[in-house]
C-alpha cells in the first residue's frame, strides 16, 4: 500500500534505525492540544464545529441566568464576522488565583483546560457547557478574542490571539450599575476554512433555543451582516411561558386534536430537579417532533428523561381509559399515543450523566422514575379536569392504534402467503414474527459466525442467514455466474423482494438487512462485496433505508474483572488511555479473530442487542452515478481502483501527516 503514496518506483529494502529517546516525547502545554487536535474538543473543524463555539460561550452566559445571577443576554454579529456575547451576571472573577498567584482567575480560566467553577455545586447548582473545557477552547481557536468584565465600578479587559495573551489585564473606571461579562471573538481561519463565516440564521436559532429553555431570560439579538428575510436584524427574544410559548410558535394551533397544550413547570428542592414540558396532539403526523434538553444541552438521542415522560403519558391514558370503562385502550402502545404528538422537554439536574462526549443522550440513574412520577401526576389532573377533552384525545389515539393493527394484519396475510410459496434456504434461522415490521436479517459468513449469531439473536424479531461459499463480486461477474451463485441465491430467496426491475418492496420479508462481518480487513472486504450486490441488484432497497452494517468489536479489554470493547485500533488506544488514567490496575487486551470466536452473550451485548449496539445505515448520496462508482471500485479494471486510491491519497496526505504523533 505504501507504494501508492510514492512516485518513486525504486523499492528500498534497507531499514534505517534511528535513536528513540526522551527528547522524542512531545509534551503539549496550555492550549496547544486544542489547536493541534481541535476535533477532540469541538467535534471537528467544519461549520457545525465553528458554531459550537457560539453555543459554548452562550452556555456560560445561560449558566449565570439559570443560577439566578443574570436576566439579560446580548448577542451581536458584527460586520467583520466577529460575534459578541454579553450577560449581566456577576462577571468572571479577576482577583489572583490561589493556585497561580501571579495570574488572575480570568487568565487562568481563559488559558487552562478544565478550569472553572462548574466542577462543584458551590457556584453553579446545574450547568451545561462542553466537556468541562469551556471558554478556554473558544480562546484557543479564535484569531481575535477580547474579554471585558464589569465588576464593582470597574471595567477589566484583556486581549488574546490563538490562546496566547496579547495584553495584561487592564483596569478602567466604569459605572457601578454595570456588571457582567462581554466576549468578542473571531474564529481562527487557520483552524476553520477562510470561507467559513457565522450563519445569522443558525446563530438566531441557537439564541431562540436558549431563550425558551429558561423563561426568565431575555436575549437581545442584533446582526450587522445581511440576514435572510425570515430573520430579524434586531429582536428581543423572550418566552415568558417557556416551552409552551415555543411549542405554540412551532405548530398550527388550528390543527390540534384538543385545543389545550399539556404543559408544566416544576422545581423541586427535595429532588434537586427542575422540569418543564409542553405536549400537543395534531390531526396528522407530518409535523410531529420531539425535542429534549438537559441543563440546556440538546439530547437528540433522548435518554432517561424521555423514557420517564413516555411512561407517564402511557400510564396516564391507560388509567383514564380504565376509569371510564373503555377497554379498547388496553393494548395501546407509546408509539400509538405519540404518533401525532409534538413534545418539548427540558430538565435541570445536578451532575447529569451523558452517553458519549457529545452529550446527545442522558443516562442519569433515577431520572426516569422521577420524571415519570411528576408528569404522571400532572397528566392525571389534566385529563380529569376536562373529561370531554380527555375522551376525545383517547379516541384519537385508539383510532391510530386500530389503524396500525389493521395494517399489520394486512402485512401478515401478505407475508404468510409469500412465505408459504418459498422454499427458504436451509441455513436460514428465521424469526417467528410473521410481519416484516420490526424484524431484522443478519447476514453472516460461515457456520461458525452463524452459530454464535443464532444463539445470540432474539428469536421473535431477528433472523440469521449464514452464507455458503464465496461471496461473489457481482460488479465483475457475468449474469450466468450471478444467477448460479449459491450465496446470492440464498440471499435473494430469503429476502423475497426480487431484484432489479422485479424488486417489490411490499414483498421484503424484513425491515432491516444487517451485514455482520468480522471487524478486521477480511470482514470489511466481505462487507464490500455484499454492499456491491445490494447497490447493483437491489438499489431501491438501499434507497428505502433497509440496509445496515453492524459494528462488532475487534478488541476486548479487561481491567479489575470489568470488560470493555473497542471496534478498532483507534478506539482501543483511547479506551486504554482512559482506563489507565482512572486506575492503575493492569489492563489485559485480547483480539477477536472473528465473530465465531465470540461467545453468544458477548455478540448479543456488543453487536445484536438493539439498545446496546451501534449500526451504520447505508445510504446512496449519488443515485445517478452509483453504477459508475461501483464499477470503478469493484469492477474488472484494477487501474481505476489504483487511480481512485492514488487521488484520495494525495488529497488526504496532509491530514494523515498531521494526525501522526512522532
UniProtKB/Swiss-Prot annotation:
Mg(2+) 2 binds at residues 518, 520. Its cofactor is Mg(2+); Mn(2+); Ca(2+). Mg(2+) 1 binds at residues 445, 518. Binds two Mg(2+) per subunit. The magnesium ions form salt bridges with both the protein and the DNA. Can also accept other divalent metal cations, such as Mn(2+) or Ca(2+). Its EC number is 5.6.2.2. It catalyses: ATP-dependent breakage, passage and rejoining of double-stranded DNA. GO terms for cellular component: chromosome. The record marks 470, 473, 525, 641 as: Interaction with DNA. Pfam families: DNA_gyraseB, DNA_gyraseB_C, HATPase_c, Toprim. One of its GO terms (biological process) is chromosome segregation. GO terms for molecular function: ATP binding; DNA binding; DNA topoisomerase type II (double strand cut, ATP-hydrolyzing) activity; metal ion binding. ATP binds at residues 20, 60, 87, 129-135, 359. Residues 439-553 form the Toprim domain. Keywords: ATP-binding, DNA-binding, Isomerase, Magnesium, Metal-binding, Nucleotide-binding, Topoisomerase. Heterotetramer composed of ParC and ParE. Belongs to the type II topoisomerase family. ParE type 1 subfamily. Topoisomerase IV is essential for chromosome segregation. It relaxes supercoiled DNA. Performs the decatenation events required during the replication of a circular DNA molecule. This is DNA topoisomerase 4 subunit B. It comes from Rickettsia prowazekii (strain Madrid E). The gene is parE.
Amino acid at each position: 500500500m505504501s507504494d501508492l503514496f510514492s512516485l518513486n518506483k525504486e523499492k528500498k529494502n534497507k531499514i534505517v534505525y534511528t535513536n528513540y529517546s526522551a527528547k522524542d516525547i512531545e509534551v503539549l502545554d496550555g492550549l496547544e492540544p486544542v489547536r493541534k487536535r481541535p476535533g477532540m474538543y469541538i467535534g471537528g473543524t467544519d461549520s457545525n464545529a465553528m458554531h459550537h463555539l457560539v453555543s459554548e460561550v452562550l452556555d456560560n452566559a445561560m449558566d449565570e441566568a439559570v443560577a439566578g445571577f443574570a436576566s439579560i443576554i446580548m448577542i451581536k454579529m458584527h460586520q467583520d464576522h466577529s460575534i459578541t456575547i454579553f450577560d449581566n451576571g456577576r462577571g468572571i472573577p479577576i482577583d489572583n488565583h490561589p493556585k497561580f498567584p501571579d495570574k488572575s482567575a480570568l487568565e487562568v480560566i481563559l488559558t487552562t483546560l478544565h478550569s472553572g467553577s462548574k466542577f462543584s455545586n458551590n457556584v453553579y447548582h446545574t450547568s451545561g457547557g462542553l466537556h468541562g473545557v469551556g471558554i478556554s477552547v473558544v480562546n484557543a481557536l479564535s484569531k481575535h478574542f477580547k474579554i471585558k468584565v464589569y465588576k464593582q465600578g470597574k471595567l477589566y479587559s484583556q486581549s488574546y490571539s490563538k490562546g496566547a495573551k496579547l495584553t495584561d489585564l487592564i483596569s478602567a473606571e466604569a459605572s457601578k450599575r454595570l456588571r457582567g461579562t462581554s466576549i468578542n471573538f473571531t474564529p481562527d481561519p487557520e483552524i476553520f476554512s477562510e470561507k467559513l463565516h457565522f450563519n445569522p440564521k443558525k446563530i438566531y436559532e441557537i439564541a431562540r433555543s436558549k431563550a425558551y429553555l429558561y423563561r426568565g431570560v431575555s436575549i437581545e439579538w442584533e446582526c450587522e451582516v445581511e440576514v435572510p428575510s425570515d430573520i430579524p436584524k434586531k429582536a428581543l427574544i423572550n418566552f415568558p411561558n417557556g416551552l409552551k410559548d415555543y411549542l405554540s410558535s412551532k405548530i398550527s394551533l388550528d390543527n390540534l386534536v384538543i385545543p389545550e397544550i399539556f404543559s408544566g413547570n416544576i422545581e423541586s428542592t427535595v429532588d434537586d430537579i427542575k422540569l418543564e414540558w409542553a405536549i400537543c396532539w395534531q390531526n396528522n403526523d407530518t409535523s410531529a417532533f420531539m425535542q429534549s434538553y438537559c441543563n440546556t444541552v440538546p439530547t437528540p438521542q433522548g435518554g432517561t428523561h424521555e423514557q420517564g415522560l413516555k411512561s407517564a403519558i402511557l400510564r396516564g391514558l391507560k388509567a383514564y381509559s380504565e376509569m371510564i370503562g373503555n377497554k379498547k385502550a388496553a393494548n395501546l402502545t407509546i408509539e400509538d399515543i405519540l404518533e401525532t404528538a409534538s413534545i418539548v422537554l427540558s430538565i435541570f439536574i445536578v451532575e447529569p450523566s451523558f452517553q458519549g462526549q457529545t452529550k446527545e443522550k442522558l443516562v442519569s440513574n433515577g431520572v426516569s422514575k422521577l420524571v415519570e412520577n411528576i408528569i404522571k401526576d400532572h397528566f392525571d389532573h389534566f385529563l380529569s379536569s376536562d373529561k370531554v377533552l380527555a375522551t376525545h384525545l383517547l379516541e384519537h389515539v385508539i383510532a391510530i392504534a386500530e389503524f396500525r393493527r389493521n395494517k399489520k394484519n394486512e402485512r401478515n396475510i401478505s407475508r404468510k402467503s409469500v412465505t408459504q410459496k418459498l422454499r427458504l434456504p436451509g441455513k436460514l434461522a428465521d424469526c417467528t414474527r410473521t410481519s416484516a415490521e420490526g424484524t431484522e436479517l443478519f447476514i453472516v459468513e460461515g457456520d461458525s459466525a452463524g452459530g454464535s449469531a443464532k444463539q445470540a439473536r432474539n428469536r421473535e424479531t431477528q433472523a440469521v442467514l449464514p452464507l455458503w461459499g464465496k461471496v461473489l463480486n457481482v460488479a465483475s461477474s457475468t449474469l450466468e455466474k450471478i444467477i448460479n451463485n449459491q450465496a446470492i441465491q440464498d440471499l435473494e430467496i430469503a429476502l423475497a423482494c426480487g431484484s432489479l426491475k422485479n424488486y417489490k418492496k411490499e414483498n421484503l420479508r424484513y425491515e432491516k438487512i444487517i451485514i455482520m462481518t468480522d471487524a478486521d480487513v477480511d470482514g470489511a472486504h466481505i462487507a464490500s462485496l455484499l454492499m456491491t450486490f445490494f447497490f447493483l441488484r437491489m438499489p431501491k432497497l438501499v434507497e428505502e433505508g433497509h440496509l445496515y452494517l453492524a459494528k462488532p468489536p475487534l478488541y476486548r479489554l479487561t481491567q479489575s474483572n470489568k470488560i470493555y470493547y473497542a471496534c478498532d485500533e483507534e478506539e482501543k488506544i483511547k479506551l486504554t488511555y482512559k482506563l489507565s488514567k482512572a486506575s492503575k490496575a493492569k489492563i489485559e487486551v485480547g483480539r477477536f479473530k472473528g465473530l465465531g470466536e465470540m461467545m453468544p452473550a458477548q455478540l448479543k451485548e456488543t453487536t445484536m442487542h438493539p439498545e446496546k449496539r451501534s449500526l451504520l445505515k447505508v445510504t446512496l448520496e449519488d443515485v445517478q452515478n452509483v453504477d459508475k462508482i461501483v464499477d470503478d471500485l469493484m469492477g474488472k479494471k484494477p487501474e481505476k481502483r489504483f487511480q481512485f486510491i492514488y487521488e484520495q491519497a494525495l488529497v488526504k496526505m496532509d491530514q494523515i501527516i498531521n494526525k501522526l504523533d512522532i
